[in-house]
């Protein structure tokens, strides 16, 4: 992870807070943000509480691998279509700026069943629907898709109880982040795996 760059919202901020990525990986993740705000270079809050224009922060990095995750905030604040359009534009911008650098687009992580009831856009069935669209989007651009749900969801598709870190049913504890980081390290993404997302799912 020493040459990895994590880009995203407060969920990705956990990689700056917990082992094994803390003080190792570069984390350009900002609280309560969505792709459209990064595209417009809004000021965002870093994990340490400092504030900076988000795209300006991202574009000066020199990673060997990039891991991107957005969606939790966007699904609450805008339509699915708007989120996917802005996400597509941001991925294009990242491809242009970091030409030749592998970009891994991660699935939106699962929430607790209770959180899905409180905020229907974050219900796990809906999240899986959007993840299908994100997977197709990533593959269509020649990027890699990582299904973090495999490491974080229980048999019912909800965030595992032993990974729940806060009252909101979204963010995880150190155990959850360790499992997530291990999944990233142990899953090589290859083209045959990604082909399935082009032809399957409701957004195919």
Predicted regions and their residues:
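Catalytic His-Asp segment of secreted/periplasmic serine-dependent ester chemistry enzymes
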Residues: 111-204
């Amino acid at each position: 992870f020493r040459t990895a760059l994590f880009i995203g919202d407060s969920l990705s901020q956990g990689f700056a807070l917990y082992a094994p990525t803390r003080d190792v990986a570069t984390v350009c993740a900002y609280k309560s943000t969505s792709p459209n705000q990064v595209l417009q270079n809004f000021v965002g809050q870093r994990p340490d509480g400092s504030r900076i224009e988000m795209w300006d922060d991202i574009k000066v990095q020199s990673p060997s691998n990039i891991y991107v995750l957005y969606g939790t905030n966007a699904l609450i604040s805008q339509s699915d279509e708007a989120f996917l359009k802005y996400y597509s534009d941001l991925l294009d911008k990242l491809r242009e700026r970091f030409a030749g650098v592998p970009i891994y687009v991660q699935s939106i992580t699962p929430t607790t069943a209770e959180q899905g009831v409180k905020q229907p856009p974050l219900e796990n069935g809906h999240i899986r629907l959007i993840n299908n669209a994100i997977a197709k989007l990533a593959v269509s651009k020649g990027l890699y898709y990582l299904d973090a749900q495999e490491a974080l969801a229980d048999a019912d598709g909800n965030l595992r109880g032993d990974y729940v870190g806060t009252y909101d049913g979204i963010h995880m504890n150190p155990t959850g982040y360790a499992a997530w980081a291990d999944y990233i390290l142990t899953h090589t993404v290859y083209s045959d795996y990604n082909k399935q997302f082009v032809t399957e799912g409701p957004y195919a």
